[in-house]
């Protein structure tokens, strides 16, 4: 049996075990998604356009098909094989490319390339101007996260534990690194990050690795989340989200593990705190924001890890990784809601519905606009402005769809 098949079976077994635990006893309550209640908005949110990369028949799949922006264009991909370029201001589709591949990891974009990976191990490189395919290569493993693009190399993770460095000109492999994949892991991989002469990436074994961009030699590796526990479920320690780099510091978070700050040059851990996340974190000014596995949004001081605030109003709503605006943090949930929180206090500041389909990937912020794509490939763009009102006046935002039902997956 090949590595991919073994990994797929392991993931399926984990899901079956988790479902079995949830269903085996009527005495044990299943965590219910928090109900959305009316709020007093401090931001005005206006939907300005929508577009779709897939048709209405597309199945909602939790894949790593997020949005990317380069210049005045946003790029999106759908599992059925289409890739589109959209004008950010108007929502007009500028071109559509058809790969006929089961796309599963992307998009990544620069001024020179648009990259998307597939579940059958292909990586496509397109011309941003017209969507023409410049080259494609076949990797040995499924691609579940966007690639990273730099002038001299492309870095991409595959589900078999490998980090590949490819030439931007034709996709030929420059070097690769590999980490052992545990017998059981979450379905997902971390997006690599290129910082100077280092490629950084998290792995399913709870480690972050830094490799030299020139030859792939390992500069350091750090164990963020040591696997612990008796069962394989308890020992899950995946780092499935991108690390964040600020100056000489690296920030990362793992599942059933820790959020930590490391030194970029050496990998030394400066501080760490218990946390569990498979969606990830974002960094802004002097704070980082983490979407936890159980649906809390937590703000921490970047230098010390001290908690600034913790918002529990969105518990068990399957939050996406957060993004930041000037005064707000934005995340999305399993029912297609987009939530804005005040950056200073964590208070809910606004809410908008995109429909009833989950949003798995992080919102993308472009100036005062927020772009999201749901798991069926529908893209929504919102313009966000401060809400001015007389003292004592308030504007209520009421949920537009019914409260979630127990049988909905989180």
Predicted regions mapped to residue ranges:
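Loop/turn-rich, solvent-exposed surfaces of beta-rich toroidal or solenoidal domains
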Residues: 289-299, 306-340
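Extracytoplasmic beta-rich repeat domains
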Residues: 28, 42-68, 95-110, 133-150, ...
């Amino acid at each position: 049996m090949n590595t991919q098949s073994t990994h797929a079976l392991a993931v399926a077994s984990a899901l079956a075990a988790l479902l079995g635990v949830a269903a085996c006893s009527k005495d044990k309550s299943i965590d219910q998604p928090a109900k959305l209640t009316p709020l007093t908005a401090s931001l005005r949110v206006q939907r300005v356009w929508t577009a779709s990369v897939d048709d209405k028949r597309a199945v909602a799949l939790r894949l790593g098909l997020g949005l990317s922006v380069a210049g005045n264009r946003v790029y999106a991909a759908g599992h059925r094989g289409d890739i589109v370029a959209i004008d950010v201001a108007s929502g007009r589709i500028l071109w559509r490319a058809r790969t006929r591949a089961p796309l599963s990891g992307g998009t990544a974009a620069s001024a020179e390339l648009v990259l998307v990976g597939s579940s059958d191990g292909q990586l496509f490189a397109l011309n941003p101007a017209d969507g023409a395919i410049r080259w494609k290569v076949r990797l040995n493993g499924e691609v579940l996260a966007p690639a990273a693009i730099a002038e001299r190399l492309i870095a991409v993770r595959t589900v078999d534990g490998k980090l590949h460095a490819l030439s931007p000109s034709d996709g030929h492999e420059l070097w690769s690194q590999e980490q052992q994949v545990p017998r059981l892991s979450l379905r997902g991989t971390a997006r690599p990050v290129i910082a100077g002469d280092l490629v950084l990436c998290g792995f399913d074994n709870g480690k972050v690795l830094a490799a030299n961009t020139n030859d792939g030699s390992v500069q350091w590796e750090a164990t963020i989340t040591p696997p612990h526990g008796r069962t394989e479920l308890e020992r899950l320690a995946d780092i499935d989200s991108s690390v964040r780099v600020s100056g000489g510091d690296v920030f990362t978070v793992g599942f059933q593990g820790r959020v930590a700050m490391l030194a970029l040059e050496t990998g030394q851990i400066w501080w760490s705190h218990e946390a569990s996340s498979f969606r990830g974190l974002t960094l802004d000014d002097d704070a980082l924001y983490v979407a936890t596995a159980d649906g809390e949004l937590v703000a921490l001081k970047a230098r010390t890890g001290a908690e600034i605030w913790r918002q529990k109003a969105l518990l068990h709503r399957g939050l996406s990784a957060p993004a930041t605006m000037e005064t707000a943090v934005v995340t999305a949930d399993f029912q297609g809601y987009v939530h804005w929180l005040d950056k200073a206090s964590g208070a809910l500041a606004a809410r908008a519905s995109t429909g009833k389909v989950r949003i798995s990937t992080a919102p993308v912020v472009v100036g005062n606009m927020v772009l999201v794509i749901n798991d069926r490939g529908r893209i929504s763009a919102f313009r966000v402005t401060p809400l001015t009102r007389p003292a004592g006046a308030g504007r209520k935002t009421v949920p537009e769809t019914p409260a979630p039902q127990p049988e909905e997956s989180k």
